[in-house]
Amino acid sequence: MACCINGNRNTNISTGDDVLIIGSGPIGMLHVQLAKHNGARVIISDPIESRLEIAKELGADDTINPTKEDTIERVKELTEGRGANAVIVAVGTTETARLGIEASAICGSVNFFAGTYPQGEIALDPNVIHYKQIVLTGSHDFTPHDFTMALKLMEYGIVKVKHIISHVISLDDVSKAFETVANHEGLKVVVKMD
């Protein structure tokens, strides 16, 4: 959660911004809530319909299933052709990194919140950054202030983490936890240490 606060700050999300979040896993869901708290309009893209439904419950204004519609076209449609002021790439693939850059508006920012696995590279035309004046950032850590802020946002109910925890599994059933995650069943799986 604290690292998401750091990512939102690095992306300069402001009131009235159109924010695209690519990926609606646990981290994407936290970014949805933080962007809404900052006054942004939130668009989230993910191929898993059940996750998109949860994202709507947590405040996402619009959802995009990239298996059913073109993400870039839909973002442009939703933003009157501008693109997203801020993009958070919360999925670690080179494809989503390229998508984030393409979806950003002029003077937009793109935050690579997930490292790629396996490690990969993207071909990048510097003219895209130059002429669109895009700021590219990455985030993975947090400050002590971010940690304190995360606790306060959860304490005051501004960020709802219970919606994100989909399974609580005992240590004895830890193999079931891995299976649940591998099959994309639910969101955050917590292993309870009894």
Predicted regions span which residues?
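A general structural signal for well-ordered alpha-helical segments in protein cores
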Residues: M1-C4, I72, A84, A97, ...
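Hydrophobic packing within well-folded, soluble alpha/beta domains
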Residues: C4, V19-I21, A35, V42-I44, ...
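Hydrophobic residues in well-ordered beta-strands that form the structural core
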Residues: I44, F112, L136-G138
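Residues in the short beta-alpha loop(s) of Rossmann-like NAD(P)-binding domains
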Residues: I48, T116, F142
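Mid-domain Rossmann-like dinucleotide-binding core that forms the NAD(H)/NADP(H) cofactor-binding site
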Residues: M1-E69
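Glycine-centered, small-residue-biased loops immediately flanking beta-strands
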Residues: D17, G108-S109, L187
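Glycine-rich cofactor phosphate-binding loops and adjacent beta1-alpha1 units
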Residues: T11-I13, E53, L58-Q133, S175
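C-terminal hydrophobic helical "lid"/dimerization subdomain
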Residues: R98-E102, P144-D194
